[in-house]
């Protein structure tokens, strides 16, 4: 066993003495040592209950003959960090989580790992760690929050963000906003739509790193506890068979994940995270691959924010296995890949079926013949930009309008709330990329303000930052190269006409190439906003969004 390095032989008597100081017995030290990474904390609703998940995982490990060793991981709540300096830290914590899990796992020679995440950056951070460490591993997430019905509307966190915009526009009273605040998040779990957390939890299942049900079983259901116990039992089997992440996270597994991503209409953040996870196993996923898969995989689901269904509805309709079963009917998935069940994808979905075709469309009756995410290119985004096509109003799929340029999210929010944005405008928020932010903040506050004020069918927003999975509307992010790196978005001026053509994958500023080159020569990078601490180091090392915003060894 790998753990023999810390527990076998006379030379390891001091090591065993330290284990015994914590109450471990000789019998426990004879068994496989399984690291259990628990990201439970009291600031993230999706993580407040993870102690119960961890206890179930540890029970499963013991039942199967292993010895669990629990340790903690950090986790930021993107919702609470939203709209202020705190959001600069969110994406950056993905790397901190991966690095800290790597350090703990390799420092203590665990035989296997169980990762317990739930929310936005914790899931990909732990998947990156699993891939990098490459000992047998399984992910068991905390599960989605329920959506509560209020006044004939299914609420979620995004409902509250949009309510603030509606209040600013005089369309809701303060009391009505308060009622949303009281009802929108009824308990523990990852926010209830197909936002980033649930997107990544579902894709974990598709990649083969989580058990069937990992993405959709609600947080408060007893089935989630049973799933955690099964994950604990399964990791011991994976250790015995030495099935590692490198056996599971193959190029075909990532193609499956991208296909289901398109079918579900996942968060655009998945386009940041899947390349970063792939990078850990030496693979490259670029925007061209994403576009190719999007062009042939139909969109089968319109979950919030694209529609009114939530993840609990997807669960009731058959979950991720049912979606995969539909895609398999047109040979859009690789079915002979090994997963953490010890079985193949084909075996995992063999008995799956759609129970509600209102939630999961038939492969022959999709919402659209192409996927939920589109990659755009043009002179405004030579290296690409990303939009959640499934959440864009039909009238905004093709749009031209004058640029309204802001050099920070804060300035844009102020202008939107003060009624300074007009129908037809294209709001550009720049210097919010991985380097420029630094940290590539999510723009949920401005997009929700636009939607809440009733402008989501008239106003587009373009940024080198990124968007929450809860964002809807013509919200185009990840513009690469970013402004801080001298990308063309840095030289756009107020009044320049911006041309958006999502069906044809185009994003341009309508000025001559000679003028673009002239402005680029005159441009000078502004001083970095943050130079100290972790974000200062992060800004120096982070790559462009089109590469997954990974840290590069320079």
Curated annotation (Swiss-Prot):
Gene that this sequence comes from: ilvD
Assigned protein family: Belongs to the IlvD/Edd family.
GO molecular-function terms, A-Z: 2 iron, 2 sulfur cluster binding; dihydroxy-acid dehydratase activity; magnesium ion binding
This protein's name: Dihydroxy-acid dehydratase
EC primary class: lyase
Cofactor remark from the record: Binds 1 [2Fe-2S] cluster per subunit. This cluster acts as a Lewis acid cofactor.
Catalytic residues in the record: 468
Protein function: Functions in the biosynthesis of branched-chain amino acids. Catalyzes the dehydration of (2R,3R)-2,3-dihydroxy-3-methylpentanoate (2,3-dihydroxy-3-methylvalerate) into 2-oxo-3-methylpentanoate (2-oxo-3-methylvalerate) and of (2R)-2,3-dihydroxy-3-methylbutanoate (2,3-dihydroxyisovalerate) into 2-oxo-3-methylbutanoate (2-oxoisovalerate), the penultimate precursor to L-isoleucine and L-valine, respectively.
Swiss-Prot/TrEMBL keywords: 2Fe-2S, Amino-acid biosynthesis, Branched-chain amino acid biosynthesis, Iron, Iron-sulfur, Lyase, Magnesium, Metal-binding
Residues where N6-carboxylysine is found: 121
Organism classification: Bacteria, Bacillati, Bacillota, Clostridia, Eubacteriales
EC number: 4.2.1.9
Catalytically driven reaction(s): (2R)-2,3-dihydroxy-3-methylbutanoate = 3-methyl-2-oxobutanoate + H2O; (2R,3R)-2,3-dihydroxy-3-methylpentanoate = (S)-3-methyl-2-oxopentanoate + H2O
Pathway stated in the Swiss-Prot or TrEMBL entry: Amino-acid biosynthesis; L-isoleucine biosynthesis; L-isoleucine from 2-oxobutanoate: step 3/4; Amino-acid biosynthesis; L-valine biosynthesis; L-valine from pyruvate: step 3/4
Cofactor: [2Fe-2S] cluster; Mg(2+)
Annotated source species: Acetivibrio thermocellus (strain ATCC 27405 / DSM 1237 / JCM 9322 / NBRC 103400 / NCIMB 10682 / NRRL B-4536 / VPI 7372)
Superkingdom classification of source: Bacteria
GO annotation terms (biological process): isoleucine biosynthetic process; L-valine biosynthetic process
Oligomer status and interactors: Homodimer.
A single cellular component GO annotation: cytosol
Binding-site residues, [2Fe-2S] cluster: 119, 191
Binding site for Mg(2+): 78, 120-121, 442
Annotated SUPFAM superfamilies: IlvD/EDD N-terminal domain-like (SSF143975), LeuD/IlvD-like (SSF52016)
NCBIfam families registered for this protein in UniProt: ilvD (TIGR00110), PRK00911.1 (NF002068), PRK06131.1 (NF004784)
């Amino acid at each position: 066993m790998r753990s023999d390095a810390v527990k076998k032989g006379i030379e390891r008597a001091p090591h065993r003495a330290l284990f015994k100081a914590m109450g471990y017995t000789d019998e426990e030290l004879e068994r496989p040592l399984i690291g259990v990474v628990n990201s439970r904390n009291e600031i993230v609703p999706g993580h407040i209950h993870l102690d119960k998940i961890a206890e179930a995982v540890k029970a499963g490990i013991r039942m199967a003959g292993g010895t669990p060793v629990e340790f903690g991981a950090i986790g930021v709540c993107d919702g609470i960090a939203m709209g202020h300096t705190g959001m600069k830290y969110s994406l950056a914590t993905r790397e901190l989580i991966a690095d800290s899990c790597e350090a703990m796992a390799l420092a203590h020679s665990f035989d296997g790992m169980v990762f317990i995440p739930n929310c936005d950056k914790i899931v990909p951070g732990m998947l990156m760690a699993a891939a990098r460490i490459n000992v047998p591993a399984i992910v068991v997430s905390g599960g989605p929050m329920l959506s509560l019905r209020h006044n004939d509307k299914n609420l979620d966190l995004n409902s509250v963000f949009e309510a603030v915009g509606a209040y600013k526009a005089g369309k809701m009273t303060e009391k009505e906003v308060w009622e949303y605040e009281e009802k929108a998040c009824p308990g523990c779990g990852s926010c209830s739509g197909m936002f980033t957390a649930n997107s990544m939890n579902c894709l974990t299942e598709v990649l083969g790193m989580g058990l069937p049900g990992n993405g959709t079983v609600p947080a408060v259901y007893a089935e989630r506890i049973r799933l955690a116990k099964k994950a604990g039992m399964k990791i011991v089997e994976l250790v015995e068979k030495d099935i590692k992440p490198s056996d599971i996270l193959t190029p075909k597994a990532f193609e499956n994940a991208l296909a289901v991503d398109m079918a579900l209409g996942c968060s655009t953040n998945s386009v940041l995270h899947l390349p970063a996870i792939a990078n850990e196993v030496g693979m490259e996923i670029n925007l061209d691959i994403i576009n190719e898969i999007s062009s042939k995989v139909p969109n089968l689901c319109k979950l919030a924010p694209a529609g009114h269904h939530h993840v609990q509805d997807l669960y009731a309709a058959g979950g991720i296995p049912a979606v995969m079963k539909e895609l398999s009917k047109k040979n859009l998935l690789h079915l002979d890949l090994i997963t953490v069940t010890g079985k193949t994808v084909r075996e995992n979905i063999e008995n799956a079926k759609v129970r509600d075709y209102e939630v999961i469309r038939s492969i022959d009756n999709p919402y659209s013949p192409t996927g939920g995410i589109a990659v755009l290119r043009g002179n405004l985004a030579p290296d690409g930009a990303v939009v959640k096509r499934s959440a864009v109003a039909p009238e905004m799929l093709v749009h031209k309008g004058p640029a309204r340029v802001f050099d920070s999210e804060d300035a844009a929010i102020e202008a939107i709330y003060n009624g300074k944005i007009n129908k037809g405008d294209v709001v550009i928020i720049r210097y919010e990329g991985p380097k420029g932010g630094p940290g590539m903040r999510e723009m949920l506050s401005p997009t929700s303000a636009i939607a809440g004020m009733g402008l989501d069918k008239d106003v587009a927003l373009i940024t080198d930052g990124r968007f929450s999975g809860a964002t809807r509307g013509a919200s185009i992010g990840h513009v690469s190269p970013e402004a801080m790196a001298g990308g063309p978005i840095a030289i756009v001026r107020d009044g320049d006409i911006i041309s958006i053509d999502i069906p044809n994958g185009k994003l341009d500023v309508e000025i001559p190439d000679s003028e673009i080159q002239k402005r680029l020569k005159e441009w000078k990078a502004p001083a970095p906003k943050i130079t100290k601490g972790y974000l200062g180091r992060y800004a120096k090392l982070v790559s462009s969004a089109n590469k997954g915003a990974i840290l590069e060894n320079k």
